[in-house]
Amino acid sequence: EKLRPETLKLINETINRLGYLPNQSARQLAGGATKSFGLVLPRLDHGFSLQIASGAHNEARKHGYDLLIANADNDDILQDHYLRYFMGTQMSGVMVQPMASPDWHPAMTKMPVPIVHLDIHCSEPGYYVAADNEAQGRIIAELAIARGAHHIVVVGRAAFMQLTLRVLGIHKALALHPDIKIEVIDAGEWNTAADGY
């Protein structure tokens, strides 16, 4: 940007000819942080996690950042390992989509790099981005009611906070319709196509 175009062209040709690769560790020592974000996902085989990865990648690229993605394989210990790894490499920030139980809370606090928790609700201080799962449940119930449903069945693991909040929204919507039955079947996994995801 500060060089004449012909000088920049000559530099780039020399870089390509010599196969020069900048030392990212040296850049970190000089500048303190990388132009990269880390993203820790619980699994790489779930559509929602893939949408998060795609959206994060697009936004990072749009703003001149790189995105490194780690698969925690539904393992809290591995998730914490990747969080610590990304912290140690001085990322500009880390996003994590934890496997959330109703009693979930952030494992790490007061970190030198901003952490954003995705698809999770928490009252503790921090950065969180999540859908309104209770409103989703209400909308689902309202649609079922509008279509004449007499019985609503929800299949999923009650241990997951998102499902708990959706069921709460369904119950609230059904409060005015006591004749409609709701049944929750605690089965399946959150990340398999066979379970409707």
Where is each model-derived feature located?
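Helix C-cap/helix->beta junction micro-motif
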Residues: L18, H63, M111, H177-P178
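Conserved hydrophobic residues forming the short capping helix/wall of the S-adenosyl-L-methionine
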Residues: I15, A60, H171-L174
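Venus flytrap/periplasmic-binding-protein-like
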Residues: V116, A175-L176
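N-terminal helix-turn-helix DNA-binding module of bacterial transcription factors
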Residues: E1-T34
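Charged active-site motifs of nucleotide-sugar-dependent glycosyltransferases
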Residues: K35-S36, D66, H151-I152, I180-K181
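Secondary-structure boundary elements
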Residues: I145-H150, A175
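Alpha-helical recognition/docking segments in bacterial nutrient-uptake
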Residues: G32-A146
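Hinge/beta->alpha junction and helix N-cap segments in small-molecule ligand-binding domains
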Residues: E6, Q24, P42-Q51, I69-L78, ...
